[in-house]
Curated annotation (Swiss-Prot):
Cofactors: dipyrromethane
Note: The porphobilinogen subunits are added to the dipyrromethane group.
PROSITE patterns assigned: PORPHOBILINOGEN_DEAM (PS00533)
GO terms of molecular function: hydroxymethylbilane synthase activity
Record bears the keyword Transferase: yes
Cofactor note: Binds 1 dipyrromethane group covalently.
Name recorded for this polypeptide: Porphobilinogen deaminase
GO CC terms in record: cytoplasm
Gene: hemC
This protein's UniProt keywords: Porphyrin biosynthesis, Transferase
Species this chain originates from: Staphylococcus saprophyticus subsp. saprophyticus (strain ATCC 15305 / DSM 20229 / NCIMB 8711 / NCTC 7292 / S-41)
Organism placement in taxonomy: Bacteria, Bacillati, Bacillota, Bacilli, Bacillales
GO BP terms: protoporphyrinogen IX biosynthetic process
Family named by the database record: Belongs to the HMBS family.
Reaction(s) the record says it catalyses: 4 porphobilinogen + H2O = hydroxymethylbilane + 4 NH4(+)
Job description of the protein: Tetrapolymerization of the monopyrrole PBG into the hydroxymethylbilane pre-uroporphyrinogen in several discrete steps.
Length: 308
């Protein structure tokens, strides 16, 4: 096997999950020679704006995909929730490995439970999806935008006027943070996760058969089926980070997939949600799209996309 070059964002989390995935590949073939090439993306350069206000898709992947096209790298290890639902021609998701905790982690000063936060408490999040769901359930809380890596956000919780922050559990787990810092993990009844949250997507060139054969050995088809339902919903709804959209699928031992899709208005006042069960992940994503659009969810997306 030739020497492989992996493309990764420069963030601590991106580099950590890239190294962890490389370790999985080397467990299969210890003779593999793999190096990481760090790539700066547009999303990494935007530190003073809310991503939902920047517009566009693929803020954290476009530059990495260009490196794939130019043969500067052989594969890219993405957080799947950052990957637009349509993959460019010539590239493919070569594998979806095991999924980390897909839920959101709630971390509060003095570990005050979410349902006990006083009125007007400030909850920090970088996500419209999280903000809308929190406001729907707890309308007297305030949502305040927060950016930065995990360390930065935890520091802001301690030093600024935030009473709590919410971030993806998967990032905390991959970075080795102990459960002790988490006040609670928010299940899907409290907060429906982002599409693909907790999953990685390993992207490579569609014609790289040698690499695709290697990647197939660390592919998890059950996870792939679940994220296919989620990403089908994202595609059909024309969702992006400008839209409070969530979706989460699980697969049972008998092959049945349960998928819940969610669209909300940013203020949390409008909510469209539906759950379906079946065995065809694409059909499930399409069915939830159809139901939510019939209920009027497309009006929210249309209005938000027109604002950009």
């Amino acid at each position: 096997m030739r020497k492989l070059v992996v493309g990764s964002r420069r963030s601590k989390l991106a580099l950590t999950q890239s190294r962890q995935f490389i370790d999985k590949l080397k467990a299969i073939d210890p003779s593999l020679e793999i190096e990481i090439k760090e790539i700066v993306t547009k999303g990494d350069l935007i530190v003073d704006k809310q991503l939902s206000k920047v517009g566009g898709k693929g803020l954290f992947v476009k530059e990495i995909q260009n490196e794939l096209f130019n043969h500067g790298i052989d594969m890219a290890i993405h957080s799947l929730k950052d990957v637009p639902s349509v993959i460019p021609d010539g590239l493919t998701l070569g594998c979806i490995p095991d999924r980390e905790n897909p839920y959101d982690a709630y971390i509060a000063k003095n570990h005050v439970p979410l349902n006990e936060l006083p009125d007007n408490s400030i909850v920090g999040t970088s996500s419209l999806r999280r903000g809308a769901q929190i406001l729907a359930k707890y309308p007297k809380l305030q949502i305040k935008w927060i950016r930065g890596n995990i360390d930065t956000r935890l520091n802001k919780l301690e030093t600024e006027d935030y009473d709590a922050i919410i971030l993806a559990a998967a990032g905390l787990k991959r970075m080795g943070w102990s459960d002790d810092i988490v006040t609670s993990y928010l299940d899907k009844e409290t907060l429906i996760p982002a599409i693909g949250q907790g999953a990685l997507g390993i992207e490579c060139r569609s014609d790289d058969e040698t690499l695709l054969s290697l990647l197939s050995k660390v592919h998890n088809q059950d996870v792939a089926d679940c994220v296919t339902a989620e990403r089908t919903f994202l595609t059909r709804m024309n969702g992006s980070c400008q839209v409070p959209i969530g979706g989460y699928a699980t697969k049972e031992a008998d092959g049945t997939i349960e998928f819940t899709g969610l669209i909300m208005s940013p203020d949390g006042k409008e909510r469209y949600q539906h759950t379906v069960r079946g065995t065809d992940p694409v059909a499930l994503g399409e069915e939830v799209t159809k139901v939510l659009n019939e209920q009027g969810a497309y009006e929210i997306i249309k209005a938000l996309n027109e604002e950009q």
